[in-house]
Amino acid sequence: MSTSNDPSNNASAGKCPFHAETPKQSAGSGTANRDWWPNQLRVDLLNQHSNRSNPLGENFNYREEFKKLDYSALKADLRALLTDSQEWWPADWGSYIGLFIRMAWHGAGTYRTVDGRGGAGRGQQRFAPLNSWPDNVSLDKARRLLWPVKQKYGQKISWADLYMLAGNVALENAGFRTFGFGAGREDVWEPDLDVDWGDEKEWLAHRHPESLAKQAIGATEMGLIYVNPEGPNASGEPLSAAAAIRATFGNMAMDDEEIVALIAGGHTLGKTHGAAETSHVGAEPEAAPLEAQGLGWHSSYGSGAGADAITSGLEVVWTQTPTQWSNYFFENLFKYEWVQTRSPAGAIQFEAKDAPEIIPDPFNPEKKRKPTMLVTDLTLRFDPEFEKISRRFLNDPQAFNEAFARAWFKLTHRDMGPKSRYLGPEVPKEDLIWQDPLPAATHQPSAEDIASLKTAIAGAGLSVSELVSVAWASASTFRGGDKRGGANGARLALAPQKDWPVNAIASRVLPTLQAIQRASGKASLADIIVLAGVVGVEQAAAAAGVSVNVPFTPGRVDALPEQTDVESFDLLQPLADGFRNYRRIEGGVSTETLLIDKAQQLTLTAPEMTVLVGGLRVLGANYDGSKHGVFTDRVGVLSNDFFVNLLDMATVWKAADDNAELFTGSDRKTGEAKYSATRVDLVFGSNSVLRALAEVYACADGQQKLVHDFVAAWTKVMNLDRFDL
């Protein structure tokens, strides 16, 4: 036996020999599963933002905490901060107005209407990758400047709200009258993993504008919020930038007037920074050394800040009063002819030809400059349609002010969902069509009314499949990213949702439910649709031998056609809904990946997704009434048959088409065909994580658990848009 004085013993006394060398491994290091299997299904996307990452705990209620906020005092502190120039990051012209406007804009500007992801609603700018995007250089300083204010007010104001409010206060401090402000953005505590920022592996990799119209990605280059300010791929051509500008702003549902107003308004205040070549700039925050404490882009040029600051590499000041609102942007745009030049960093920009030096230097009051513009600023003059709007704003400053106020409000609130989510004393009274407005409630059904309605629905001759399917069709449009969609409003009865192929059930079932609604007069159609699902689930559970009361809370209302923007709502039409075995377009992303995408939009966990798919299959809820995945001979019974039969080794599966979208399950011994299935169905037996979940419900003791878990997940989906609960 080895002892401590044994010369053959290499480890010192009392120490483990395995710890004698410098550690080379740690938790999470080494080759990961996705390195081996890059196409592995991202079930982990359904585990984001759980209570395990939230330091505030599950009982924290931001809406209640916000009520304790001294809103006026907070705004006063923000106003004071704007002119409290710090030595470590001096303010241009003694004011952080431009910096805070840019911070708010870049926080909100990542939103895209196609999938509802991105935007300012969760304070993601403080996390990677956004905190380190090339377009967000120096915004780490803006957020750090806000820290004393955040520290003072604590959880009464979220970071997400503070970023946006700081931008609003900056505009007000510049003399601009904003449209209003709604708080209500709740922080999360880790980066969003579900947002597709693109496949590029290099920062500022160029994308063609035509490709932007075919995907959800908002920017023309990886790491930009919108477009390259030097023109497409730094071409220096103002006119060619128009298509890229329309494509990127169009992904936020901004029209030409809103585009012109936003660009001009954002560039009425502040400046860009390009004191020297960007080679002086160090690593972004995520790659910066530990001692940088979350700050990045340390510059070796001069002081690295103030007059020596390098951000975009462009050195542009647009107006004569960069800390005061004016119409100088348009006046300068049309008053001068512009010649292409380069910034001290070598970036392409334009300077006013033969103009006097009328632009104040940000740090030396004795110095003046000529007016300068970005390549994309000149697009507003040389694109024919943009030029018409720009000239109108030139001649009518009040029209410009009104347009910018509304466009800025839309930009900073577009991902917040309905107006009912807004908090604070500055919420505008006017309802805007992009907020998906709803009328005031006119029905308050009592418990007795609800019982009578359930009886009427149960006696209407509708099957369990029909009852469940119509409720799912109504509620499952919800998107957790921008809080749009859902059952409230009964927009399933309106264009465009009633005409979607996936909602074919609506034309068959809604007339019956509408007749019940008219006869009763006690509840909205929206409530009756959800109540139909309640009746269907309760009947299906009872048929399985489990008695349940599915929770139901009335209070939904019915939207009017004039409150429904058809084009905007058509973006909610699913590419696929694996819960109903529906896929609209073949090819591209795998069907099972689209199931994960849909489940994530519905804010479901992996167990919730699993039990809902299995339950909906045996209830016969496929959109077209097909038998794919209906692994049961007792359709309409909320059984665990889907899981039992899927995991039965007596069945062997083979692809039934060339694309491996459909499969046939046959008896392993006889070869007799038993079932048909889609990729969504089989993934619960194929994927190791989902199979582990499926096994829970396939066990002998899984039936009752399945019913109760299904009811809980079902109720969650039905109430996703009930922000009043």
From Swiss-Prot:
A single MF term (Gene Ontology): metal ion binding
Cofactor: heme b
Cofactor note: Binds 1 heme b (iron(II)-protoporphyrin IX) group per dimer.
One Pfam assignment: peroxidase
EC number: 1.11.1.21
Crosslink site: Tryptophyl-tyrosyl-methioninium (Trp-Tyr) (with M-252): 105-226
Ranges where the record places region Disordered: 1-35
PTM remark: Formation of the three residue Trp-Tyr-Met cross-link is important for the catalase, but not the peroxidase activity of the enzyme.
Listed GO biological process terms: cellular response to hydrogen peroxide; hydrogen peroxide catabolic process
Amino-acid positions noted as binding heme b in the UniProt annotation, renumbered to this chain: 267
Site (Transition state stabilizer): 102
Class of this enzyme: oxidoreductase
Reaction(s) catalysed (UniProt annotation): H2O2 + AH2 = A + 2 H2O; 2 H2O2 = O2 + 2 H2O
SUPFAM superfamilies in the record: Heme-dependent peroxidases
Gene Ontology CC annotation, any one: cytosol
Heme found in the keyword field: yes
UniProt xrefs under InterPro entries: Catalase_peroxidase, Haem_peroxidase, Haem_peroxidase_sf
The family this protein is said to belong to: Belongs to the peroxidase family. Peroxidase/catalase subfamily.
Subunit structure: Homodimer or homotetramer.
Record protein name field: Catalase-peroxidase
Organism: Klebsiella pneumoniae subsp. pneumoniae (strain ATCC 700721 / MGH 78578)
